[in-house]
Amino acid sequence: KASMSIFDSTSLLSRINRGETDSLDEHIIYNLRLAERFSRLSEGHYDVTVKPLVDAWGFAGHEAERTPNLDSLLQFVGYRRVHIRDGRLVKDDPRVQLDFNSIAKGYTVDLVAALMERCGAKNYLVEIGGECRCQGVSSKGIPWRIGIETPFDGNMSDGAYLTGRIRMSEGGLATSGNYRRFYRDAAGNKISHTIDPTTGRSVTSVSYTHLRAHETEADLV
């Protein structure tokens, strides 16, 4: 949803991050509460307050800092530092910033799927940026076949190199990895866009694929 964009300087989330407003809409409230649940389940390894770290490492449109001061940044990263009170966001520290990029596509997929079901669709496949949700069967009358990309560095060819395919008739699927959005620092270390909020550093896992009943949750996991 547009209100959760960190790339649009006029979005509600961008204004919240700049401290210009503490008002929340239904989309941010829903996703913040869902994110908090997964933050607790993951013991903080998933956390939407990760934005200062994402910025410091040079993702989300920012230039990477030569040597990010992780100890300093981690002081205002943590899901326990934000609270919802009467429809407004309360931050324990004004420097806390939110980034819903890890959940926004999956959430949008779920919204589109819900709209299709309200319109009477029994068979559909919704896909946005690699996140998908399906129900029923394809036009061939068989379960949907969803390809899982081979995770080698620089694989930018959608569907050209696949590890395998999954047959699905219901549910959401999300794949995330470090083989597309990454760079190498001066020492040759690979820095991926997936940041562990507990350490402040990028993760080394190559690729994950998750299946859930709803795409928003698959995206989160």
Task: Say what each PLM segment does.
Residues 1-215, 221:
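Mature catalytic core of soluble alpha/beta enzymes
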